[in-house]
């Protein structure tokens, strides 16, 4: 699969088959992720991979923490978003909600519970960075995550980046023995997509180029 095709076809997946992902495939995907560029080759990213019983223990811990703290999904900004930006989120919710709604479960509940369970994926990857790095180095980590997502897609695997779990930094760090010097940036679900699930039967729209590009000639 060429890189353009992978970029065009990949999407976030929120329902997975109960099919094991081999360690070899995980290692191959991560070996592609670390090829991403970084400032003066700092390579500030680290990946913690959980699967099997350890992944299930992590999920139970996160779901328990969610019930105790009720962390809500959202953009995480201190000030209201500009309308043109907030409309994108509202449009995405309108597209997604009919596919994921269930009796007694709201959109937010689906996202919050799904985030804490990695949407049932067999593999959960935790992405961390050393706290000594300035925030600008998050961009380097983002590049590595993009490489990871595309490499997974090229191998026939599905993913979903999950930012909400960063709110449970203490729980995850304690369970996985992550140093206090490390910061959890996000999680990534990894597995084989359940193509028959309504949760995967949609694609969100991207802004038109004229909305995001300024040309100077």
Residue ranges, per PLM feature:
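Short acidic N-proximal helix/loop "leader" segments that mark the beginning
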Residues: 1-20, 24, 28-31
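C-terminal helix-cap and adjacent tail motif
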Residues: 6-13, 83-90, 185-217
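Solvent-exposed alpha-helices and their adjacent loops that cap or buttress functional pockets
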Residues: 39-42, 116-119, 176-180
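Short loop-to-beta-strand entry elements in the cores of soluble alpha/beta enzymes
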Residues: 40-51
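Glycine/small-residue-rich phosphate/adenosyl-binding loop
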Residues: 49-134
């Amino acid at each position: 699969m060429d890189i353009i095709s992978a970029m065009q076809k990949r999407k976030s997946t929120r329902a997975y088959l109960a099919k094991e992902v081999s360690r070899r495939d995980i290692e191959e995907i991560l070996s592609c992720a670390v090829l991403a560029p970084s400032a003066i080759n700092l390579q500030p990213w680290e990946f913690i991979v959980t699967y099997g019983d350890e992944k299930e223990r992590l999920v139970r811990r996160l779901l328990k923490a969610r019930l105790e703290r009720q962390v809500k999904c959202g953009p995480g900004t201190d000030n209201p978003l500009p309308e043109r930006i907030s409309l994108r989120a509202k449009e995405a919710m309108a597209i997604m909600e009919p596919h994921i709604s269930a009796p007694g479960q709201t959109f937010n509940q689906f996202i919050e519970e799904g985030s804490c369970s990695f949407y049932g994926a067999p593999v959960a990857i935790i992405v961390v960075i050393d706290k000594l790095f300035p925030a600008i180095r998050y961009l380097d980590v983002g590049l590595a995550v993009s490489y990871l997502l595309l490499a997974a897609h090229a191998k026939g695997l599905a993913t979903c980046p999950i930012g909400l779990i960063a709110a449970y930094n203490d729980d995850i760090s304690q369970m996985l023995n992550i140093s206090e010097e490390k910061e959890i940036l996000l999680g990534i679900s990894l597995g084989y997509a359940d193509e028959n699930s309504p949760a995967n039967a949609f694609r969100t729209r991207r802004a038109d180029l004229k909305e995001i590009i300024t040309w100077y000639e």
